[in-house]
Regions:
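Ferredoxin-type iron-sulfur electron-transfer modules and their immediate structural context
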Residues: 1-118, 181, 188, 213-364
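Short, flexible hinge/linker loops that cap or flank conserved catalytic cores
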Residues: 32, 120-123, 232, 425, ...
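Iron-sulfur-cluster electron-transfer modules
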Residues: 36-39, 49-209, 335-519, 657-666
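Short hydrophobic beta-strand segments
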Residues: 127-132, 212, 430-436, 541-549, ...
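Cofactor-cradling patches in redox/metallo enzymes
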Residues: 166-174, 438-524, 550-663
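Short glycine-/small-residue-rich Rossmann-like dinucleotide-binding loops
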Residues: 215-217, 376, 506, 619
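A conserved helix-loop-strand patch within extracytoplasmic ligand-binding domains
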Residues: 520-544
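Ribonuclease/tRNase effector modules and their secretory precursors
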Residues: 649, 654-655, 659-764
């Protein structure tokens, strides 16, 4: 037996197979973090969706805290807001959109203002002055205070209340008092009752690093210059000023002006860092299928009551995109959208020293490609995980443990169990039947019947190739092993005259096409052409079809399978998530080896779609469904009238492959395969067999350990259980066997393994 060398712990190859640019492009396809339609329409980027979420729960304090992030004076802004967000609400497509403005007013009215942070904040050294009153100076004062600028406001008004009244005379008295309280609590310096004549202003300008003013004052200082609408700056005069048109304009201009102040004090261009200002276009996708429209809650002139605001907020559908997560067990289990998960996986590949905590998530993806179909932008999580695995392998940072058993199984299929022969009477053939490694392991009689039928009913000769297509190493990211498999298969195909491959498995079909560039068709296509075998018979009860991951995007295969079932008289029940949207059974991508619990949940998810028996055209799918207790048949079982009806364990699967090879060589090519025979027997308790299958320990591994025991007689005797315990290291794994000796040989009661190496001290 050939073993795979474990990675080196100190030797690192700096060969990245995944670039940051490629990953950034892939991540950009995920729209999960794109702003909701209402949020994107707001020039302040108010998180309206989040506000409505908390308002619907009656948590007006939390909702107000979100609103306070975008403006220092929420009551003034919400009263003057023109609500561009409302027309972008997706509910407008079905009926009435959300009355966002009225809910915001209720949030401001009923919400408890948050306490100012007690965290010590360092004030900036540069000083600012603001001359005049009105909406723009008021909002700008609040924005500069947020940014911790020492700011002095010079105005003609006599006090805070008059200053607020000058800016927002339409406010109700109670609202005005609240905003006065908010303004007076800010860390700002006010000089009331000033005569804002030019000598006074110019004298105060000398005391400041940045000069800001109302439009009225700015015209006095620079009558021939107007402020740039993008940066709110009269550049020649060096005065920051803004418009006097509306509440929305003034508040937005104040935000722009505050950024200008930031840039000026840093000696940077005031035109830089402006890309993210204002309303934006969102790429968010929200599936409205199944949504129902509703009428908005009527609003009186006094606005919503608290209860009415809660009911209106509850109408919000919380626009988001989770199309891929709806059907993908993998993404749901990790509770992360693909963009975030992909970023974490990429970062994991770049770690040189330290723990690679994303190895298990990276290896848990089934690489099925379902997300590419469900995602509106075709985000391919399978490509991310596959590239990450290859990257970890190429940099010698990928542990062998998660995939070693599957890789060893592939090597077994392509060595001891491998067979390649032309049809008797032919040196080269028109076709070669490639049933796939799982078919020979699970239903060897089906392989025999299918091959003999193809030989009888097709012209030009049909060769047979038993082996693995290389998908195992491809999924594991072991690209060098895949190349060796490709080379082996190419050489064998060349001996046969490079025939067309008749694949019995859609994953094999896909792998052989992509890796070898070979001519490949499915056995189902051949049978559709030459007709059903005589023994073909469908089930008498309705059945559900599970489409294999390897057939995703292959409409021809999907249609042919359904046509064959119809020809056999099967009644097919349509299920959710079928054809290209079909989920993975849990075997693909080696999930069943790297994360058994995840794979089991994937299988359960597949079976939730219907209570009917499942018809598959992938033997691995059929095997996993049977193991979950669901009646399942591979379509070839129906076509050839064979019900394998078995659930072979991992050791039986290997034995089935060897036995299939032996029988075919003997019955078709008249060749005898000499099987090794022992002069003793090894028996197993049922608990031992179950345990070994669960822990992926082969009977051949146990027998190798017992063979070593026969040579060295090294074992520990357990006085309590009267069992012998022996061990042996095979490749990268140390196997332990608990057994008793019998007259015929040995009875194995338990077996377990680990990856530690037991060192024996000699002479001590």
């Amino acid at each position: 037996m050939t073993y795979i060398q474990e990675r080196g712990s100190t030797h690192v190859y700096h060969v990245n197979r995944m670039s940051k640019e490629e990953m950034d492009h892939m991540i950009s396809l995920c729209v999960h973090e794109q702003p909701a339609y209402c949020v994107a329409a707001c020039p302040f980027k108010a998180d309206t969706k989040e506000m409505l979420f908390y308002a619907a729960k009656g948590n007006f304090k939390k909702a107000l805290a979100i609103y306070e992030k975008i403006t220092p004076f929420p009551m003034i802004l919400c009263n003057g807001c023109t609500a561009p967000c409302e027309e972008k609400c997706r509910l407008c497509e079905l009926g009435d959109g959300i009355s966002i403005r009225e809910v915001e007013r209720a949030i401001v009215r009923y919400g408890e203002p948050g306490k100012r942070s007690s965290v010590f904040r360092i004030r900036k050294k540069k000083k600012a002055v603001i001359f005049g009153s009105g909406l723009f100076p008021l909002f700008l004062a609040g924005e500069l205070e947020k940014k911790m600028y020492p700011a002095t406001i010079y105005c003609q008004e006599k006090d805070y209340e008059a200053y607020i009244a000058a800016a927002a005379p339409e406010l109700l008295e109670s609202d005005r008092k609240n905003e006065v309280k908010r303004l007076s609590s800010m860390d700002l310096s006010f000089e009331f009752g000033c005569s804002l004549d030019l000598p006074f202003i110019r004298a105060k300008m000398k005391e400041a690093d940045v000069v800001c003013a109302s439009e009225e004052v700015a015209k006095k200082l620079a009558p021939e210059e107007t402020a740039d609408a993008e940066i709110m700056l009269r550049e020649q005069a060096g005065i920051v000023s803004g418009p006097v048109r509306s509440v929305m304009d003034a508040a937005f201009a104040a935000k722009r002006a505050a950024l200008t102040v930031d840039l000026l004090v840093q000696n940077l261009s005031p035109h830089s860092n402006r890309d993210s200002e204002g309303a934006v276009t969102t790429r968010l996708y929200t599936n409205m299928d199944g949504m129902k429209g509703s009428k908005k809650i009527p609003c009186s002139t006094d606005g919503y009551s608290k209860e009415e605001a809660i009911e209106e907020a509850k109408r919000c559908i919380q626009c988001h995109c989770d199309e891929c997560m709806k059907s993908c067990v993998y993404l749901r289990e990790y509770k992360k959208h693909p963009g975030l998960l992909a970023r974490e996986i990429y970062n994991n590949t770049q770690i040189i020293m330290g723990d690679h905590q994303m190895n298990k998530p990276m290896n848990s993806c089934s690489l099925c490609g379902q997300c590419t179909v469900t995602c509106p932008n075709g985000f391919d999580m399978s490509q991310v995980c596959k590239s990450a695995r290859e990257n970890m392998v190429s940099t010698d940072k990928m542990p062998l443990a998660p995939h070693e058993f599957a890789l060893m199984d592939m090597l077994f299929s392509n060595s001891e169990a491998f067979l390649c022969r032309p049809q008797p009477g032919y040196e080269t053939c028109r076709y070669v039947f490639f049933p796939g490694c799982q078919a020979g392991a699970i239903a060897p009689d089906v392989v025999t019947e299918a091959y003999e039928d193809l030989c009888r009913r097709t012209e030009g000769g049909v060769a047979l190739m038993l082996g693995c297509c290389g998908a195992i190493s491809e999924w594991a990211g072991r690209y060098e092993m895949t190349e060796k498999v490709n080379e082996q298969l190419k050489q064998e195909l060349a001996k046969l005259g490079d025939p067309m491959i008749i694949a019995g498995c859609p994953s094999c079909m896909k792998q052989l096409k992509e890796s070898l560039g070979a001519k490949v068709t499915g056995i189902w296509e051949i049978l559709k052409e030459i007709g059903l075998p005589g023994q073909a018979k469908g089930l008498e009860i309705p059945v559900a079809i599970h489409d294999a991951c390897g057939a995703r995007g292959d409409t021809q295969t999907q249609d042919t399978i359904r046509e064959l079932l119809a020809d056999m008289g099967c009644t097919v029940v349509n299920t959710e998530y079928s054809r290209d949207r079909s989920p993975c059974c849990g075997y693909g991508g080696l999930t069943a080896y790297a994360n058994k619990e995840m794979a089991d949940k994937m299988t359960e998810k597949c079976l939730e779609r219907s209570d009917c028996p499942y018809i598959t055209y992938c033997m691995a799918c059929r095997d996993r469904f049977v193991r979950e207790g669901r009646e399942s048949r591979h379509i070839l079982e129906l076509l050839y009238g064979i019900n394998a009806a078995n659930m072979p364990d991992i050791s039986e699967k290997r034995y089935n492959r060897l036995e299939l090879k032996e029988k075919l060589l003997k019955n078709i090519w008249n060749e005898e395969l000499m099987m090794e025979k022992k002069d003793y027997t090894v028996a197993y308790t049922e608990d031992a067999i179950s345990m070994m299958d669960e822990r992926m320990i082969l009977k051949s591994d146990v027998e190798r350990v017992l063979s070593d025991y026969r040579e060295n007689q090294e074992a520990i005797f357990d006085e309590e259980t009267k069992e012998l315990v022996t061990r042996s290291r095979l490749g990268n794994v140390t196997f332990w066997v608990r057994f008793v000796e019998t007259e015929e040989g040995y009875l194995v009661r338990r077996a377990y393994s680990h990856r530690m190496n037991i060192m024996k001290r000699v002479g001590q």
